[in-house]
């Protein structure tokens, strides 16, 4: 059985994601497609607009065979750890033949060359990186500038690196490749050229509109029919059903009062979070005293060194309670389990193959004794239940994977 994998967030699923699924199947000629997906919180530091079980069901209805949850520790981490968490889980299954991700450049060799350089970190690169960081430049930008200067004698290469590293999906793709190299994985990487609007584009203006534009529309409008052209049919019908039921779409602003209340209640332990350094905690505390929306709060805190998404992740981690965990130790380890959120009949065959070839623990229901990584997922869902009244406290203990039969793809 030829099994391919994709790493996704689906916040929410749109036509660009359906394109990714179809192109992956065509490019890899796979018999089955496994998806590892962020749960109730996503990498930019937002609560997911839909709960993880609803997202997983949509994925199965649109061509994925098996959906595995990416632990919250990784889904709310930098691109480096986000990628490593996903790839390490996939590699541990011992049955994944390939992984396919979208990128702006669509050239696997160019991305592979940069990934190799970043992983090996030659001395000159380290010195250049430190010099830029010392100037107060964000890590992502400093890395970009260091690589450009490292290749200053090769004008074409230098210009290409600058272009590649200025685009988010290229950066994430490089991190997937670094993780594969680090793990000495046999999984073969593929990339497809990303289609449609940039993820920051908040306008609905083409077939492949961004997830940001869809979230913005849902936040401001009630006429779901406008989104019919931008969502897969099954996803559009599910959204209509959810709206009819009075489903509560979770938006980032819904976290703010909980975060502010936590701060004024005396929980001033942001310094325990990995991404918080150099007095950033005090900067955040001061901003919490006078900002009442997510955008205004993050907008006041962010700087050249601290990017918008990094601040968003810090706020999300604080909301959930990451500061009470030994994050350094957790991030240095690799997950020893996979949690199934949804499957179809082909996905069940994939699960049988995993059981035969891998020693990783497969969870369809939560075990009596949960490890630290899994307990953090449970805590995240409980925090999410404050934002989404369709999700109960301890929902993780009540839910089993959905098995969907006779999908059309």
Swiss-Prot record:
Gene3D superfamilies: HUPs. It catalyses: cytidine(34) in elongator tRNA(Met) + acetate + ATP = N(4)-acetylcytidine(34) in elongator tRNA(Met) + AMP + diphosphate. Its EC number is 6.3.4.-. It is found in: Cytoplasm. ATP binds at residues 7-20, 102, 169, 194. Belongs to the TmcAL family. This is tRNA(Met) cytidine acetate ligase. The gene is tmcAL.
